Regions:
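N-terminal intrinsically disordered, cationic/polar leader segments
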Residues: 1-94, 98-173
Length: 173
């Protein structure tokens, strides 16, 4: 049975943080680090652009539910970030990218290890008034966005597991 919709009532737009990452910065990991440093636990990624190398993005293949087949596109050379959006909930980064290289455009779910090539400029908006987190959905095997009353976890830190790449690894076992 598919997960139910989630609506977080009472959310308010907070302050906006504009970030420029530099050559060699890890995109996903830097976003998480900046949110921790700035104490902004819940964020909407408004926009972002720049260039990356050591790229890894994942996505779903096929129409079946729950998803069982995934692609993982990796590029060691430079690609341009055309668009970037997502939600950071309890410091857990869930970001999708539209990218291009000389062969054309493609996209997917941002995975760890993607390095900034020349720059990445990103606008983040804090979400106030609600507590957001990601919880494991047993049907999809993914961590889905939820409105929660508490941030308590077993080790006190958010679990970054739950990307499509992680789900695909789990299914291969």
């Amino acid at each position: 049975m598919p997960a139910k919709r989630m609506i977080a009532r009472g959310a308010r737009a907070g302050g906006i943080v504009v970030v420029r990452l530099a050559y060699g910065d890890l995109l996903l990991e830097s976003l998480q680090e900046i949110c921790r440093e700035q104490k902004i636990r819940n964020v909407v990624i408004l926009t972002g652009f720049g260039s990356l190398t050591d790229l890894s993005v994942t996505g779903v293949v096929g129409p079946e539910f729950p998803p069982r087949r995934f692609y993982n596109r990796q590029r060691p050379r430079g690609v341009e970030i055309i668009a970037m959006s997502g939600v950071i909930a309890d410091y857990h980064v869930h970001c999708h990218l539209v990218l291009c290289d000389r062969r054309g455009a493609f996209g997917g779910h941002l995975e760890p290890g993607c390095r900034v090539l020349s720059l990445a400029e990103i606008a983040l908006m804090r979400v106030d008034g609600v507590k957001l987190a990601r919880r494991l959905d047993p049907t999809t095997g993914q961590k889905l966005l939820e409105s929660v009353t508490s941030y308590a976890t077993a080790n006190g830190r958010p679990d970054q597991e739950g990307s499509l790449h992680t789900v695909a690894r789990r299914l291969r076992r």
